């Protein structure tokens, strides 16, 4: 085993060498870290964080097939609306819509009754895992004690989690949370409760809910939680390069894994690059993104009933985070155009010049 491991590291280092000689300065610094990593690193599993409106079943299927490198995908949270589960949420977690990938469905609920309603759907669909969202920072939901808005109320968190675990001893529950809604200490006040409960893992994004995605991540706040947490802990937040991942795993060596959302939407190859220890070339990236785009476009064309306008709107969101360093003029056209033909030619230009 150790001999194979050494051979694998040597192979990864050999793959890096040409980039040191011919790569630009960004590639060279990435590669130096990759070589260091290949010699020292314990590669952690990468999980794909859910983003409402972006990482639906269509996107997940295409990403898993074309890029891969992801151990687990999470569905955007399933929630109750007007007393019932939103139909599109139920469709999104259908096992038939998520073949050949490991999906953990996520839910958001302000109380045990609503949670129970959603859990019955998960169980009906055959899921044995569920992620409970205590991290969503959107004020409309948070004000009603959903997601991150529940963190200042330890009794409510306790009632929600204890009830779920008592009613479903066979389900492996995980929790995704932030440091707090208003104060970073909110998560620390909950830590004795978390440590007591039989959770599969915890995902922590080291920001406050009221920050949304603004400002810096608070690594000291993360560290305070990390030191006392007895469950497998996953880090989430502001990871855009393989270097970013490595600096976090070096600082927090006991992490069980890494969860990435926006960083993977911007660079869908990020998990792959981290795992193989080499960046993929611009040509390879353009080719793979082209395949991803074609697959997602064709799937939406078949699914959506609202004609060209609806399809265009959906595809514009596909580009919101993707390839931020791509041609600016082409990106502008993609977001401004109201014609499908102009959109398609702007996509070709963007990929052709990448």
Each model region followed by its residue ranges:
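Glycine-rich, positively charged N-terminal anion/phosphate-binding segment
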Residues: 40, 51-121
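Active-site-adjacent beta->alpha loops and helix N-cap segments on the catalytic face
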Residues: 83-89, 139-162, 211-223, 269
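Active-site beta-loop-alpha junctions enriched in small/polar residues
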Residues: 51-53, 78-80, 108-110, 135-137, ...
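Hydrophobic faces of well-ordered beta-strands that scaffold small-molecule active sites
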Residues: 46-49, 73-75, 103-107, 130, ...
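Short, small-residue-biased leader/transition segments that mark boundaries at the very start
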Residues: 1-6, 22
């Amino acid at each position: 085993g150790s001999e194979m491991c050494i051979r694998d590291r040597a192979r990864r280092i050999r793959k890096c060498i040409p980039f040191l000689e011919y790569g630009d300065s960004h590639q060279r610094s990435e590669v130096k870290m990759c070589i260091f990593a290949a010699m020292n690193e314990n590669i952690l599993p990468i999980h794909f964080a859910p983003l409402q409106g972006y990482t639906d079943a269509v996107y997940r299927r295409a990403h898993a097939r074309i890029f891969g490198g992801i151990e687990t995908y999470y569905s955007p949270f399933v929630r109750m609306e007007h007393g019932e589960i939103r139909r599109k949420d139920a469709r999104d977690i259908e096992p038939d819509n998520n073949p050949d990938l490991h999906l953990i469905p996520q839910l958001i609920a302000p109380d045990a009754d609503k949670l129970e309603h959603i859990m019955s759907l998960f169980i009906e669909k055959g899921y044995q895992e569920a992620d409970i969202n205590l991290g969503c920072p959107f004020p409309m939901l948070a004000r009603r004690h959903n997601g991150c808005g529940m963190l200042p109320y330890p009794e409510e968190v306790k009632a929600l989690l204890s009830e779920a675990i008592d009613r479903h001893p066979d389900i492996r529950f995980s929790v995704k949370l932030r440091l707090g809604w208003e104060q970073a200490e909110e998560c620390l006040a909950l830590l004795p409760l978390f440590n007591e409960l039989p959770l599969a893992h915890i995902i922590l994004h080291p920001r406050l809910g009221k920050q949304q995605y603004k400002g810096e991540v608070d690594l000291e706040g993360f560290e305070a939680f990390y030191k006392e947490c007895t469950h497998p802990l996953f880090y989430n937040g502001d990871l855009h390069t393989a270097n970013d991942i490595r600096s976090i795993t070096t600082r927090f060596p006991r992490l069980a894994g890494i969860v990435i959302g926006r960083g993977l939407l911007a660079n869908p190859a990020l998990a792959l690059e981290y795992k193989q220890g080499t960046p993929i070339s611009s040509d390879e990236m353009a080719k793979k993104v082209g395949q991803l785009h074609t697959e997602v476009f064709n799937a939406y064309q078949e699914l959506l009933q609202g004609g060209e306008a609806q399809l265009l709107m959906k595809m514009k969101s596909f580009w919101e985070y993707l390839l931020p360093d791509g041609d600016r003029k082409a990106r502008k056209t993609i977001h401004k155009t109201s014609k499908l033909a102009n959109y398609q030619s702007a996509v070709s230009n963007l990929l052709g010049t990448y």
